[in-house]
Amino acid sequence: ELDYHALSFHASDPDLDSAGVELKSGQKVLKELEEIFPEMVLVDSNHGSMKYRKAKVNGIPRELMVSYNVACGVGEGWTWFNNFTTKMADGRELFMTHGMTKNGVQLAREMGMCVIQGHYHTEFNIQYCGNPNVLNWSMMVGCLINNRSMAFAYNKTFPARPILGCGLI
């Protein structure tokens, strides 16, 4: 997804790209990814939803907004969902979300199924929880943030650092 640093509700760094420049450069990267992955299911995030949240706070109806596919410059093969549940190879359900709680295994307990989530830059793990009927797991996939980027400079005030990661099922 795109970071949308320049659209953030937080103060933007004047030495970083404007929203338009950031969008154009992001579209190029997403187009490259689309060539590799022409069909993808993605979950909405606090970054991807930025254009909608900024429009809402400024009184702009969603009908005046272009779709996220158009904004990102990708085709209809990419589909975004608020959250997504699918069946795994063993027939069990898997719940995917951008981020609901930092405690992923607790989310697996609450959902009653295995879960995958991101958002929490400093969390990368797989944890298990079980009961007499089922063994579920939670996968926290870290992030793909560039810790040296000026857009992530706010992190320098925290002791924890992002963990680069990716999950594969």
Task: Describe the function of each predicted region.
Residues 11-17, 86-93:
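Short, basic, glycine/proline-bearing loop/turn elements
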Residues 40, 77-79, 94:
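Short, conserved active-site loop motifs that form the nucleotide-linked donor/cofactor pocket
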Residues 1-74:
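Core catalytic region of metal-dependent phosphoesterases/phosphodiesterases
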Residues 58-86, 120, 136-148:
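Active-site-proximal loop/helix segment associated with metal-binding centers of metalloenzymes
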